[in-house]
Amino acid sequence: MYAGTCGETMICAGGTNFPDKPMLEGGAKTWTDRIFTLSPGENGWTEAGTLPAPYAYGASASTREGLLCIGGCGKEGHRKDVYLLSTADGAVTVTPFPPLPIALAYTAAAVLDGKVYLTGGCERPREQDCTNRMFMLDARQPDRGWQELAPLPGRGRFLHQMAAADGVLYVLGGIGLRERDGKQARELLTEAWSFTPECGWTRLPEMPYAIAAAPTPTPVSRNGVIYLLGGDDGSGKKYTPQTNPGFNNQSLCLDTAAMEWHDAGPIAAPRAVLPCCAWQGRFAAVNGELKPGRRSPEVWSITLS
C-alpha cells in the first residue's frame, strides 16, 4: 500500500489482502483503491475517497504538497502512474502527476530538499528482472517531469530500503536476481550505498546481514542514525509456509556519522513490505505482512531520540 502525510494528516491508500481465506488455503488476492486519513486528535481512521484504480506495491513519498503514490502494480500489470494525494477540510484530492519513464513496482523512494528520488524496482511481473536505474522529480516543479540520474553502481534490486539524512540519500539492502538452473532466483543483498547530487554514489560498509522489505522510507533519528526495523532476512526459507513464524524481529541501525552498523535490538511488531512515514514526532509503520501471504491491519509507531 501507499502511506505518508499531507501536513498533519496521515494518508493510507491502495494495497492488497486476502479477505475470504488465507493465501495458503487458496485465498484469492484482492486489490483495493480505498483511501483513509487520520488527523491528530481523532480516534480512528476516516474513509476519504478512492484512487483512480486499485494499486499496490509502489513507492510512497511525503512532500510539502502531499503524499506521492509512485508506480506499483494492479491486476493488469506494473504501472507508470504517479498521483499526488492532498487534503483540505477532511477531503482527499487525487491529482495526476507526471508518470514515470518506465513502469516500476517494488521500488523505493526518499525525499531530499523537496526532490523525490526513486531507485530500483521490477519492470515486469513475476520478478523477471530488476533495475538499478534512478529517477528524480522536483515535487515543487512537477511539470519538468522525471529526470534519469546516474544508476546505482551495484546490483539491480527491489524491495530495498531508502532514507534521506543530512543531505544524503541512502539505498540499503533489498533483493537481487541471479540466474540459477536457467531461472531467475532471489538473492538477498547486504550492499549499502549513499548518493549526493554533488558527488554521486559512494559504496558504504556492508550490512551485517541482508534485509529486504523493511519499512521504508526508513526512520532516521535527529542525530542521523538510520533504522531498519524488521523486514525479511531470509531466515524463513528453512520453514514450510505452514510453520513460518514470521519475519525478522530484530533491528539494525546505521550511524551515518561514524559510518558503522550496529544491532538495535528486538522490535515488538515485525513486519515486511510496508510503508513508513514521520507523523506527530513519531515514525508510523503501516500494515504490511506478518508472514508471507498474511496481512496485518495494524499501525505501529516508534519514537527515536
Predicted regions, residues:
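Kelch-like beta-propeller repeat domains
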Residues: 1-305
